[in-house]
Amino acid sequence: MSKEIDIEYYHQLALQKQKEHRKVLANLKKKPPKNLDKIAQQIHEEVFAEIDCTACANCCKTLGPDFKEADITRIAKYFKMKLPAFEAEFLQVDEDGDKVFKSMPCPFLGRDNLCSIYEVRPKACREFPHTDRKKIHQINHLTIKNTLTCPAAYLFVEKLKDKL
């Protein structure tokens, strides 16, 4: 396993730069460059060459995914559980009507920061922090929010700012 990531350090940096990041992303939304998807993909790859998620796992410790029916079906099947039994054991409905974990950290996160259901993990987990998404300028609010939790998202915005 890699050197542990100082989550609080990145959180404080993200708080300090939140206003600047909002401005950069707002400008990007107003006039996105034609090659934005390509730039974002390159930056995403650079960041994840630097950051080892298993040295952090803050998303797994503090953010619960929104479970879609396909996620529930896939994971219940993996555990050879009936859907109602899986939902009763692991999930609850939040104030927005979304199905989320009953408690955090994620019950499938191991002490080694590895996901015990990695190959069948929820779509939200597979895609987090959404920095390789096409048309990233359409999810600025989510990108800013993710910088507060995810060091990779913070570095992504910093590198994006420097490239534009």
Cite the ranges covered by each PLM segment.
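Short loop/turn segments that flank or connect secondary-structure elements
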Residues: 1-164
